[in-house]
């Protein structure tokens, strides 16, 4: 632990063991707790393809007062996940030949209304070369008048396609770890 009055910033820890030197960068930060309760409602279930998202963002101060007029934004990062369906446990639905890394994208940027709410309407820009199911991580920030912000993170499953094709490989020879063919 660090002392409450310890200086913040980026520090470097160095250790010399034998003739080898090791260095590790450490970030010491002051952590501010959230002062706003944030609720992002995009409905239930899996987000499908490039279907427009419609939802509601709501925020209120932890004291119970509405967060009227505060600025807010939602950033989404999409990452690959393993595709599984409970009825088809023996099948592989992910394409190992496809690589995917998603860039962050803004879903919303604006101000909350007098009730501390905002309507969310947007589309996730999904790549056509996704290897299978994806996870969308929503980072919602609501900014206080002084510039500090509270943050909330949600993760939802995303199906980039309406239909999936799976392969079921034969069991093969487990002793030699290979498929037997005629």
Regions found by a protein language model. Give the residues of each.
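A structural signal for beta-strand and strand-to-loop patches characteristic of beta-rich domains
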Residues: 1-182
């Amino acid at each position: 632990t660090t002392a409450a009055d310890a200086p913040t910033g980026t520090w470097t820890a160095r250790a010399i063991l034998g003739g080898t030197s090791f260095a590790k960068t450490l970030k010491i930060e002051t952590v501010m707790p959230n002062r706003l309760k944030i609720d992002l409602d995009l409905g239930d279930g899996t987000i499908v393809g490039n279907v427009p998202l419609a939802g509601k963002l709501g925020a209120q101060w932890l004291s119970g007062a509405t967060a009227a007029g505060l600025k807010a934004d939602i950033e989404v990062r999409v990452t690959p996940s393993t595709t599984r369906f409970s009825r088809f446990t023996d099948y592989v639905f992910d394409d190992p030949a496809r690589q995917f890394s998603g860039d962050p994208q803004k879903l919303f940027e604006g101000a909350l209304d007098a009730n501390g709410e905002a309507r969310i309407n947007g589309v996730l820009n999904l790549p056509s070369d996704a290897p299978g199911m994806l996870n969308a991580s929503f980072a919602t920030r609501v900014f206080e008048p002084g510039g500090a912000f509270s943050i909330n993170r949600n993760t939802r499953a995303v199906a980039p396609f309406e239909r999936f094709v799976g392969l079921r490989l034969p069991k093969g020879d487990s002793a030699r770890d290979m498929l037997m063919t005629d």
